[in-house]
Amino acid sequence: MSILDEFRSFIAKGNVMDMAVGIIIGAAFTGIVSSLVADLINPVIGLITGGIDFSNVFVNLGDGDYTSLAAAREAGAPVFAYGAFITAVINFLIIAWVVFLLVKMVNRVKETALHKSPPAAKAEPAGPTQEQLLAEIRVLLKKASA
């Protein structure tokens, strides 16, 4: 089998396709979570903390005075951008929470499927007991010997 054939076989497997779909959905989900944090959660946190925008919170480690993180980075100033880190932590916590809920839901579905009893098989009609069979054999033997 050539390397090309092995590669085709590898790609055709269901696990690889499932992984590809997961990566694509994950990338889209990351955009949704980033928007959720930047556009909805951070403004509420900023309102509670007196207008602080975490995405723009930084400490300038060099000389100069910059009004925004973007201006400091554009000037090449060394900055400690802990606000961006806080935003990344919030993103991570939201993604981890959603993944936890999804795993919990899948486990519940699996558990329900495992505990579901299989449908009862049709009861087969009861045949004659051993005593009844022996009695029939005895009758047949008596008829045959007579």
UniProtKB/Swiss-Prot annotation:
One of its GO terms (molecular function) is mechanosensitive monoatomic ion channel activity. It holds the Pfam family MscL. GO terms for cellular component: plasma membrane. It is found in: Cell inner membrane. Keywords: Cell inner membrane, Cell membrane, Ion channel, Ion transport, Membrane, Transmembrane, Transmembrane helix, Transport. The keyword Ubl conjugation does not apply. Homopentamer. This is Large-conductance mechanosensitive channel. It comes from Cereibacter sphaeroides (strain ATCC 17025 / ATH 2.4.3) (Rhodobacter sphaeroides). The lineage of its organism: Bacteria, Pseudomonadati, Pseudomonadota, Alphaproteobacteria, Rhodobacterales.
